[in-house]
Amino acid sequence: MAILTQNLCRYSHTIGFSAQNGRGFNNPVDVAAAPGGRLYVLNRSNIAHAARGILRVSICTIDEEYIDQFTAFGEGDGQIVWPTAIAVDQAVNVYVSDESRHDVQAFDRDGHF
């Protein structure tokens, strides 16, 4: 994890925990930092992991405090197939782009579609 301070980026520490043992990361492809210290980690995982209930967005802090996770594999509203990027705005709305669905979906800070 890098910390941006006055346009300088310095290494702080590595965070992460595997979803193989339940909640955690599985092939993380992007991360977005929100005001207030939350990190939103976008996991690509795969269909087999999705079938086991591994969700696509993990919410944690830089200190590795697990907060929650949201979204599932699928074609419905609030579901994603092949996520490519994640972004957070100042109001802490979370945006996830999906290469397979050709869309960007918006969620609130807690993952509600």
Where do the model's predicted regions map?
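Eukaryotic scaffold repeat domains enriched in small/polar residues
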Residues: 1-113
